[in-house]
A protein has these predicted regions:
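Alpha-helical scaffolds flanking conserved acidic
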Residues: 59-64, 94-99
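Hydrophobic alpha-helical segments of small multi-pass membrane proteins
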Residues: 67, 101-104
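Mid-chain, well-packed structural core segment of small domains
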Residues: 77-97
Length: 151
């Protein structure tokens, strides 16, 4: 068992999954860029409809594609959010680590170390949110991740 597998235990992960509502995540995540520049709304709507609300791709597969791309770009908060979404789509912490590792083989060893560090930080934040009184809604998780990954 690796350290990655020890950070977020099955019970807290289960609590996060029980509290997770995809529609809440989609609403929160699709409102940021258009709030900055309304011209992006059509672009964000197309992504939302095709990959987050539509049947084009299963959430687990979507996150298997996005996590290594974001890890290869040192994406910080965006990587953390997609690690969370991957876990909510039933990826295990170990699978996420494997995805980061495989992507890093092609993008550089620094991407492996930084990606795994981001996963550890994300899992730690998720464990803290799950342990806090008052539940672990999508909004609470995203807020905690934003605070933890503020630049």
């Amino acid at each position: 068992m690796s350290k990655i597998d020890e950070v977020l235990q099955p019970a807290p992960l289960g609590a996060l999954r029980t509290a997770y509502k995809n529609e809440d995540a989609v609403q929160i995540l699709s409102s940021g860029i258009p709030a900055l520049d309304g011209r992006t709304a059509g672009y964000i709507d197309a992504i939302r409809h095709a990959f987050y609300e539509g049947a084009n791709m299963q959430p687990k597969d979507r996150e298997r594609c996005l996590i290594p791309v974001l890890a290869s770009r040192d994406a910080g908060l965006n990587l953390a959010i997609h690690i969370y979404l991957g876990l909510m789509a039933l990826l295990s912490p170990g699978e996420v680590a494997d995805i980061i590792f495989l992507g890093g083989i092609y993008s550089g060893v620094d991407r492996i170390s930084d990606g795994l560090a981001a996963e550890m930080k994300t899992l730690t934040v998720l464990a803290q949110v799950a342990a806090a009184p008052g539940g672990c809604s999508v909004e609470q998780v995203i807020t905690a991740l934003r605070q933890a990954f503020a630049r």
